[in-house]
Amino acid sequence: MTVEQKTIGIVGARGHTGSELIKLVAAHPQLHLSFVSSRELAGQRVAEHNDAYQGQLRYENLDAAAVAAKAADVVILALPNGMAEPFVAAIDAAAPQTLVIDLSADYRFDPAWYYGLPELTRGSYAGQKRISNPGCYATAMQLTIAPLLDQLAGPPQCFGVSGYSGAGTTPSDKNNPALLSNNVMPYALTNHMHEREVSAQLGVPVEFMPHVAPHFRGITMTVNLWLQQPLTREQIQARYTQRYADEPLIEIVDEAPWVSRIAGKHGVQIGGVTLAPGNKRVVVVATLDNLLKGAATQAMQNLNLALGWDELMAIR
């Protein structure tokens, strides 16, 4: 039986995540890329900028009304924080049936939107047409903390290091290779957006300290957890293994994972479980690609889930 193709448009397609989204859409047998919006690349052929796409489609500079008028089955918003609202409002008014997936932080605290971290929130999906994609750091933190959430004796402390692609394409100190050379940049050391996001989602306070490093892509998240009672390494390892046994994108490893081994891959590695003397403090490390599981891959999981398809279609 042939499944009818769905049309999809991407807004903010020039960025690193937009490029990864185009690759995933090109690999998806049931999706047709109907438009891509980029102010900077308007008029240029998509195929000239993305080897994965074969076709004549050109980038367009579309405002919110023009995006809504396209009436695509799916629209993915890959815009900087604070820019999604006009597009959402226009689609709500003109094409409310459109599935909207927003990759910014704009709707992550809105209870009317489904918060799409499938490995943790899949069971709460109930047909919502508005999906908020989690943050990249926030994804790594939640997947690391969740298996021990009921054992916490205090706020988890999360030390995150990201490649500079996480700072986007707009020039800044945090994506300037010259300034990052032989350097690590701490920033937003309290009250980071992802700190608030994880605290809200897990229902416990979380302390997060982000840093940018000279590599291009990939996140290392080192999480320090204080426990209510002593646990052995085997007990902790079993919690992770059991929690994610049926999750093909999450791999539990023995040693602390390296970010160089996850770059360009769709999944998450969690490991390096290390106990302090007394067995009431444990450190766990997670790695993921911030552009993939931290953004584009997760958006595709959410899209597939919402449309009733295999969640890993185009990802496997």
From Swiss-Prot:
<dbReference type="GO" id="GO:0070401">
    <property type="term" value="F:NADP+ binding"/>
</dbReference>
<dbReference type="GO" id="GO:0003942">
    <property type="term" value="F:N-acetyl-gamma-glutamyl-phosphate reductase activity"/>
</dbReference>
<dbReference type="InterPro" id="IPR000534">
    <property type="entry name" value="Semialdehyde_DH_NAD-bd"/>
</dbReference>
<keyword id="KW-0028">Amino-acid biosynthesis</keyword>
<feature type="active site">
    <location>
        <position position="136"/>
    </location>
</feature>
<dbReference type="Pfam" id="PF01118">
    <property type="entry name" value="Semialdhyde_dh"/>
</dbReference>
<comment type="pathway">
    <text>Amino-acid biosynthesis; L-arginine biosynthesis; N(2)-acetyl-L-ornithine from L-glutamate: step 3/4.</text>
</comment>
<protein>
    <recommendedName>
        <fullName>N-acetyl-gamma-glutamyl-phosphate reductase</fullName>
        <ecNumber>1.2.1.38</ecNumber>
    </recommendedName>
</protein>
<dbReference type="GO" id="GO:0051287">
    <property type="term" value="F:NAD binding"/>
</dbReference>
<dbReference type="InterPro" id="IPR050085">
    <property type="entry name" value="NAGSA_dehydrogenase"/>
</dbReference>
<dbReference type="GO" id="GO:0005737">
    <property type="term" value="C:cytoplasm"/>
</dbReference>
<keyword id="KW-0055">Arginine biosynthesis</keyword>
<keyword id="KW-0963">Cytoplasm</keyword>
<dbReference type="GO" id="GO:0006526">
    <property type="term" value="P:L-arginine biosynthetic process"/>
</dbReference>
<comment type="function">
    <text>Catalyzes the NADPH-dependent reduction of N-acetyl-5-glutamyl phosphate to yield N-acetyl-L-glutamate 5-semialdehyde.</text>
</comment>
<keyword id="KW-0521">NADP</keyword>
<comment type="similarity">
    <text>Belongs to the NAGSA dehydrogenase family. Type 1 subfamily.</text>
</comment>
<dbReference type="Pfam" id="PF22698">
    <property type="entry name" value="Semialdhyde_dhC_1"/>
</dbReference>
<dbReference type="InterPro" id="IPR023013">
    <property type="entry name" value="AGPR_AS"/>
</dbReference>
<dbReference type="InterPro" id="IPR036291">
    <property type="entry name" value="NAD(P)-bd_dom_sf"/>
</dbReference>
<keyword id="KW-0560">Oxidoreductase</keyword>
<dbReference type="InterPro" id="IPR000706">
    <property type="entry name" value="AGPR_type-1"/>
</dbReference>
